[in-house]
Amino acid sequence: DLWSWGQMIQETGLLPSYTTY
């Protein structure tokens, strides 16, 4: 799901804007 992307992105720090998901 998209929420997983927010978690992974937050960890990687590639796209902080995606943390909203």
Swiss-Prot record:
Protein name according to UniProt: Basic phospholipase A2 BjIV
Keywords for this protein: Calcium, Disulfide bond, Hydrolase, Lipid degradation, Lipid metabolism, Metal-binding, Myotoxin, Secreted, Toxin
GO MF, one example: toxin activity
Notes on temperature effects: Optimum temperature is 35-45 degrees Celsius.
Organism encoding this protein: Bothrops jararacussu
Subcellular location: Secreted
Tissue and organ expression note: Expressed by the venom gland.
Family, per entry: Belongs to the phospholipase A2 family. Group II subfamily.
Bound cofactor: record note: Binds 1 Ca(2+) ion per subunit.
The EC number(s) this enzyme carries: 3.1.1.4
Primary subcellular site in the record, as a coarse category: secreted
GO cellular component assignments: extracellular region
Regulation: Inhibited by crotapotin.
PTM comment, free text: Contains seven disulfide bonds.
pH influence on activity: Optimum pH is 8.2.
